[in-house]
Design a protein with these regions (language model features):
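Solvent-exposed soluble domains appended to multi-pass membrane proteins
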Residues: 1-182
Length: 182
């Protein structure tokens, strides 16, 4: 209902939706899940995929669809270790990310990226021009600018993220005028 209202408003809009049925170990089966596979988690993944597909098919039937960018992304690969027992440990597991109806054309070049790059890439995908193609720690993936992942690798980024910052340490040790921690 909210999406229909926003889509019919004639104004630019943003709507965020979250699915979490696949987020927990073994997943959370809903009343729409079918029992096709021997593992509950596989059934929950299949169920979630069917619901996302159904949602996208519904979107395609709406008047606003052709002028709407849809981003589907995860926040991390599965953490269900039991489900991964039969997956080759060398398999390169990644977070699923898809930009649908982007105003920009992807050139097909394989990129190394992280969630930092979502912000500028999403804005570019709706037609925004980004000076320098960088926002925050992210890079517009439709540009030729290098991402931090491409420049430093995942380990390099992780090393930088866990590094101590004297500035932040000082901020976290500040107390209020009454002597209590803020």
């Amino acid at each position: 209902e909210k999406l229909t209202e926003l889509g019919n408003s004639g104004k630019p809009f943003n709507l965020n939706m979250l699915t979490v049925d696949t987020h927990f170990e073994d997943g959370h089966p809903c009343d729409k899940c079918q029992n096709r596979y021997s593992e509950q988690y596989a059934n929950v993944i299949a169920c979630s995929a069917r619901q996302v597909e159904s949602f996208l098919e519904w979107c395609k039937q709406q008047a606003w669809y052709d002028n709407t960018t849809i981003l589907i992304t995860g926040d991390h690969p599965t953490m269900d270790s039991d489900f991964l027992l039969n997956i080759d440990e060398d398999y390169d597991r990644r977070v699923f990310t898809a930009y649908i109806n982007s105003a920009r054309t992807y050139n097909g070049e394989k990129r190394q990226y992280s969630s930092f790059d979502t912000f500028p890439t999403l804005l570019a995908s709706i037609g925004a021009d980004i000076e320098g193609n960088k926002l925050g720690l992210g890079v517009n993936l439709y540009s030729s600018s290098s991402t931090f992942t491409e420049e430093m690798g995942v380990e390099g980024i992780n090393d930088k993220l866990i590094a101590k910052s004297e500035f932040m340490e000082n901020l976290s040790s500040q107390t209020s005028e009454d002597g209590s921690d803020e």
